[in-house]
From Swiss-Prot:
Its EC number is 4.1.1.17. Pathway: Amine and polyamine biosynthesis; putrescine biosynthesis via L-ornithine pathway; putrescine from L-ornithine: step 1/1. One of its GO terms (cellular component) is cytoplasm. Residues 83-102 are annotated as: Disordered. This is Ornithine decarboxylase. It comes from Leishmania donovani. Signal peptide: none annotated. Homodimer. Only the dimer is catalytically active, as the active sites are constructed of residues from both monomers.
Amino acid sequence: MGDHDVALCHVSRYNHANYWAFVPLPTVSDDTGCDSLHHDSASERIRMAPPASASKAGAAEERLHPYERRLLDQYQIHLQPANRNPLSRADSAAGREETAQTPAQVQMVPVVAVADSTSDQHASVASSQDLVDLFFLEGSQAVDGLCFSPYPIYGWRTAEERRAAVCEVFKTYNVVTRLPASPAALAAAQRRYSRHRHSAIAPINKSAIETREQYWRRLSNLYTQKGVKDAASAADAAATTATNGAVPAAPAYEPEDPFYIIDLGRVVEQMARWRHELPMVRPYFAVKSNPQPAVLEVLSALGAGFDCASKEEIHMVLGRQLVASPDDIIFANPCKQLGDLREAQACGVTYVTVDNPLEMEKISRLMPSAHAIIRIKTNDSKAQCSFSTKFGAPLEDVEGLLEAARQFNVTVCGVSFHVGSGNDDQSAYVSAVRDAYQVFQQAVQYGFKCTILDIGGGFPGTEVVEGSGNTSFEAIARTIRPVLAELFGGGDVTIISEPGRYFTAASHALLMNVFASRTLRLSDVEVSRQAFQSVVSMDEPEEYQYYVNDGLYHSFNCILFDHAHPTLLLLNDGDGADGVESGTEAAAVCSEEEGETSLSGPLANDPLFMSAWDRRRSFARRPLRITTIFGPTCDSMDCILKKQPFPEMKLGDWLLVPDMGSYTTAAAGFFNGFATRRLEWVSSVDLCARPRPVYTREGNTLRCVSE
């Protein structure tokens, strides 16, 4: 199927747990020249209030491309002007201008009525691609620079410049946006098209939509095969070089080396989702979570600021020219080393977080131009990673901090908090915002006018599994929007945040190879316990130990430092999840089946569907064994799975680990000389807002014939 290249974003868009509605079906045409079929998705809409500038918005909508107009109509989005006047503040440093901007163009909460705090929110966007298309449409020339909310777009770039900047990053890192479609997906699309071509009612099975796991599995198979081919090509080139008498260069990597597949499109999608859910809050990406240059460059292009914890991170951001000015950086380490303070002063960084009087004294001596943001303690008892034991001033200590700031002549300009990472208690966010408001009032009594609210980070970046009890980002956003509007909706407060894992967690998938194994006899006690649990096959009462080429000293440091629980998936484990079959056979098997429902109106995006053959492979899964998995180093503590049920593996098997994009590579070392160096760049979304592609039938397959 290599000749059937279909845009990846139109083939592998996955169904997010929080976006159940189906995405639009791509336009399909006969090679005989029949009329194309257009379908729009159907879902409940949420009406917005009329735009403030109806005449200008109406004129802009009249000039919109039909596809763009359909997007706005589909999600009930109205164009409106935004408050683009940046907040001015007095700067106490000698020799500088009287007034300066707050973190470059960070949007302010305008004066709006807060009777209905959700009235300015749009309907949930069903498609990842639609989210991205809407993000780049907002503020563009196509809509006369108008916004979809009362808040200006992030950063200093225009909409067109943002898109061009992201495209340039993709070009620099050779990001692959086109991959072959799976035979099952194209066969399923062909069958539904031919069968229901003239009908508005078609059977749709939600369970057939390609999930994020299936997406990663499909890419994993492609790139493991690519590694073998690249290694063979390198060997041929080395042989040719040796024949000519030159010393052959060492290969970039071996075919069995571990590697990352990095989906930069997911980062773009997450920014689009953030803008949709929290348009009043500008994100300052936590560099510590993933300092990969490509990730930083994409986020810079999208208008993010940066949360830096050290002078090295400040140098990284400024050296790569990722910000318009140092005011796009917040030095968010409450306890800073003296050298870092000196360097921040030299670099022109202004905004720093503080949580104790000694820090106020240090800042007054070493960073006199700083504007302090008081970090307060929050209730993070239900967080996966809590920080209040180390950072944050209790509310009863805030007055002492304000007194110290006045004593040492340090300007206090705002309040920050962090409720911890993975905090499922939504009330913690509300309480923290209200506590911050209380500090705003206290600051006035000491002669300080606070104009910045930093709501921290820790927002979830992965899909919420139904029944897990975890809280989605959308649910958190719905919780904090009303309280932000109620307490900080007066127009004189800049609201920022410090998300890290939110942007990158789901953007990386790790592939690692099994390079050794052995078995150990289980003790009688362990045999009895495992037999009682009836979990694993006890025909061979042994512990199976495997060795893989990434471990605790490298990507899996997140187990120790981030309290993470990575998911290990065995590729080609015999359950059909990775199976590939002929298009004809798949189409034949994908017939009437249980669970199909008839939906009137729009069809789902056919290339998203996996065939019934994919889900009904008769191969039995490999037997479950008591399994321990070690990393590659000589340390016996390098263990990522210990005596747990796992499918039996063999030498050369690949393990897929999704959601490995935050606090993994950032803290990875080179212990014993091991490292994961190979990176493969892809994008699951397209950057071009345009109609869906047109497909034509050729026998039993579909071919993309237009962009």
